[in-house]
């Protein structure tokens, strides 16, 4: 296929998805020719030959590289800017989204998600590189992902980033100002990035899809204002308010304290999507009667972390009950279990990771109790993955991990292969951090070429289960169960 046919097909897709009108075609072609370093044209077939936008993207990037248009280390930015030629303006996308929303929220999100994939805002090919498997436990089937989707920056890109003058615009990666931002240095390319403007409880928010999605239709609801994360009644109201608009999705929030929170605490945001997480599938271990909220059902979830599940048809009462749990947890201590609400200087240590969904016609809130205390033995966190597990997971246990989906570092993609070689007594370059774990595995089982891969994956799953247990404040033991009931009694006073 000629380069001009590739360009024409690219333009035809832009016509089809509403980026341009027929009267814009010549203008769009000439802008694209200049962008690719071309100044000529040959008439081609108007019938589309290639309908895959990512294949066309590759073909046009190859043309640009041949013409030396892309500066060293600028591939990421140029690629996003190229796909911007195929991405409708924000006003067009918002208009079409809310028009489709009149038919159903499902129609609207399906339109936006499919478009985000077509224009490479959601990087489907990178996401497909992730290694994913599951591990069965007494709590249900945990999901494990080794995150290979985010490409490592090459040395040229790193060198180029150092030369870029520092900028405070946009203030962070979640600000609305990222929409259409070309990018520079360590600020990601967002030329083809689009955001849906949405009102939740009278406040302005943006709804977007995550470029490197961790689960199906992984999306982010971000505050129009750059302000810190905070878990409070307003947060519960926002989660439930989002469900009123998008009942087809679940939504949750990272905790708002270091160690137990996510990687971005400086910008108020929540994460949503269409995925039935392992924790959502978990049954109740026991039911609880709430003395002050008779319209709200409650129970303790059979889960390695400490989770309360509240449900009600009455959204107002449900939010009040969740807020009551939060306020009581923020002042509750049980030093026999190393649970301490505040330091002597008043520093708070207790918060909640909340998750909301609609199930069987009721609003449902899962409240995961979090404690970010540290001590001499566990300087990274008492209720954080303990050192023996750091060879697999040492990062914060955020919202997604809490719900039973492990996001493990890319290094494990190669490191675990070396562990497998070690277990088979083959020449290997196994990292020393895995030595004790691998020795333990070797002593427990005989490995063959046919069994080693699945067995190592199972062992990784066992580590993730232990990670979640470490993060649980009331352990799944008799002592932990009794401690949990004491807290419930405190709430019911």
Curated annotation (Swiss-Prot):
Its EC number is 2.7.7.12. One of its GO terms (molecular function) is UDP-glucose:hexose-1-phosphate uridylyltransferase activity. It is found in: Cytoplasm. GO terms for cellular component: cytoplasm. It catalyses: alpha-D-galactose 1-phosphate + UDP-alpha-D-glucose = alpha-D-glucose 1-phosphate + UDP-alpha-D-galactose. NCBIfam families: galT_2, PRK05270.1-2, PRK05270.2-2, PRK05270.2-3. This is Galactose-1-phosphate uridylyltransferase.
